[in-house]
Design a protein with these regions (language model features):
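Short, well-ordered alpha-helices that flank and scaffold nucleotide-derived cofactor binding pockets
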Residues: 17, 21, 49, 105, ...
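Conserved small/polar residues in nucleotide/adenosyl-binding loops
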Residues: 128-135
Length: 136
């Protein structure tokens, strides 16, 4: 089996890592390897553990934040209200280009081939190895 994973963000990199670890020939395509994606970069603690991310990529541990929408609606988030005062729970803030590169490199280290390029179309073919039940 051979698999092409299109997009080297967290989901694509994670998929490529799992496939490569299973011994499946994997290509991971990403159009911008140095992309500084304009997103908040907030990662809940459970996802830091789930993705097995090292603390070195976390720039800041946040317990309180205010999110402001483009229409200026504000939402305050406080982990103290949910978990009480504890340093064990936090939201990790990181730069996406750092996290994405870490995850892509980990997939590559496990055997995935990283390709810097834009995928605009995919040609596929059908291969029949046995007659279908309709042909009987």
């Amino acid at each position: 089996m051979r698999v092409a994973v299109i997009g080297g963000g967290p989901s694509g990199s994670c998929a490529a890592e799992i496939l490569a670890k299973a011994g499946i020939k994997t290509w991971l395509f990403e159009r911008k390897l140095d992309n500084a994606k304009p997103c908040g970069g907030a990662i809940p603690l459970c996802m830091v553990e789930e993705f097995d991310l090292p603390e070195s990529i976390i720039d800041r541990k946040v317990r309180h934040m205010r999110m402001i929408s483009p229409s200026n609606r504000e939402v305050d988030i406080s982990l103290d209200r949910v978990y009480g005062k504890s340093d064990n729970e936090f939201i990790g803030m990181c730069r996406r280009e750092v996290m994405d590169a870490f995850m892509r490199n980990r997939a590559s280290d496990l055997g995935a081939t990283l390709i810097n390029g834009l995928v605009t179309s995919i040609d596929t073919c059908l291969l029949y190895t046995s007659p279908s039940p309709r042909d009987s």
